[in-house]
């Protein structure tokens, strides 16, 4: 039996040189000032049609491609499967976005949206539009490159009338299919008591659980252990 957990996590990741940009991005998009916390539980995404609870995962790394290599390992599959979306903040002049996405999409869940947020203000919107057109034909997931400036842009639409920057990211989240989640009418909200565990600890636990599972010779005991670990980790995912 395949367990279907709510896909209600949004990960925001930056490489170290752009941590300051990430701080402002989190405040502007999610109204979140808790940038020192790796997991912010029980956030609410709300628009005129619905409300949904989600957990905000916040992380940084020295090198995004190296981070992706770890994230696409088999041990991290339970974590990938509960991701509604992944937002990567970087300078696309320093990161090769096409190679990065091809590597990333090998393992990403088909319902997970991925947004690359470019913070290099020298990159023209025409270049962004060209890459997005290529990606729209190459991937089935919602994959998008977005230019984002810390100062509010004077133009919020491209030549095709499509939204830009933060407005476009909001639109992607608004139209996302919240798989296995309780989506509430805009007039109704429920309360939950959040559980907390650092993201790094969750990854370590997944790796340890996989090693132990492989060491159990009895298939019934192995299945029982797998179900026990799935239930335990679901409290924090």
Curated annotation (Swiss-Prot):
InterPro entries: Irc6. Signal peptide: none annotated. It comes from the Eukaryota. Keywords: Chromosomal rearrangement. GO terms for molecular function: protein-macromolecule adaptor activity. The keyword Lipid metabolism does not apply. GO terms for biological process: vesicle-mediated transport. The keyword Cytoplasm does not apply. Belongs to the IRC6 family. Involved in gross chromosomal rearrangements (GCRs) and telomere healing. This is Increased recombination centers protein 6. It comes from Saccharomyces cerevisiae (strain AWRI1631) (Baker's yeast). The gene is IRC6.
């Amino acid at each position: 039996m395949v367990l279907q957990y709510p896909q209600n996590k949004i990960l925001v990741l930056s490489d170290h040189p752009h941590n300051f940009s990430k701080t402002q991005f989190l405040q502007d998009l999610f109204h979140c000032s808790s940038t020192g916390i790796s997991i912010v539980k029980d956030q609410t995404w709300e628009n005129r049609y619905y409300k949904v609870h989600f957990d905000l995962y916040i992380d940084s790394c020295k090198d995004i491609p190296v981070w992706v290599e770890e994230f696409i390992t088999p041990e991290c599959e339970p974590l990938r499967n509960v991701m509604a979306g992944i937002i990567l903040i970087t300078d696309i002049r320093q990161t090769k976005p096409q190679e990065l996405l091809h590597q990333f999409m090998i393992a990403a869940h088909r319902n997970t949206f991925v947004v690359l947020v470019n913070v290099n203000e020298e990159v023209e919107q025409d270049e962004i539009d060209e890459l997005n057109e290529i990606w729209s034909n190459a991937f089935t997931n919602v994959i998008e490159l977005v230019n984002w400036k810390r100062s509010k842009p004077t133009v919020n639409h491209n030549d095709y009338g499509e939204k830009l920057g933060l407005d476009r990211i909001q639109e992607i989240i608004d139209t996302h299919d919240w798989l296995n989640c309780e989506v509430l009418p805009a007039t109704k909200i429920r309360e939950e008591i959040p559980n907390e565990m650092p993201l790094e600890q969750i990854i370590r636990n997944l790796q340890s659980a996989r090693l132990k599972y492989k060491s159990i010779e009895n298939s019934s005991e192995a299945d029982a252990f797998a179900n026990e670990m799935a239930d335990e980790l679901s409290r924090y995912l």
